[in-house]
Amino acid sequence: MDKYNHRDRIEMIIAGEKPDRFAGSVWRHFFHKENNARGTAEAMIDFQKMFDWDFIKINPRADYHVEDWGMKQKWSRDEFKKHEKIEFPIKNIQDWKKIDVLPLSSKALAEHLKVVSLIKKGVGKEVPILMTMFTPLAIAGRMVPDRKMLVAHLREEPELIHAVLDRIAETFSKYATELRNAGADGLFFATTQWASEDMITWEKYQ
């Protein structure tokens, strides 16, 4: 029998202490179950029960961040095949003016608060839960058909894009608080492809 439970191990590592063994986790998408809260939660819970990871990194559908701003998808029925994007919120530079702060009751955001609460109920307090959240720039990058479009818009209208990033940041700052209230212990804060000079210079990123 292990000396420590999953939460003990994670808290010891955070405190700079050495647990009885390394703490590990693995995550993946279950595309065929991602189009609703219950399916997403069940997939994560089943994966946890199968392998007994030390923490759960929730892997929701990536575009939950932008659906409430107008992203539309065709849901995949294949466990290993991504959803098909069929409409993007941003088609031209003027469309950025439509991006405002979202209420947390918005459909996709509220749905994923439910995902967190269902997983917490399913695995209990001993397993720390991290919810995936992208940076504002990464979220903006999912609103366009081609990331190069965002880079071009950033060069053309930097003040406009910075204002949009502020609205995205405000939305997800409030959302992070609600995720904690729903049962999340922390965030997996992802830059996705934007932490690369292949996409944008360090100066522009700053």
Regions found by a protein language model. Give the residues of each.
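Active-site loop segments of alpha/beta catalytic cores
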Residues: 1-34, 43, 47, 54, ...
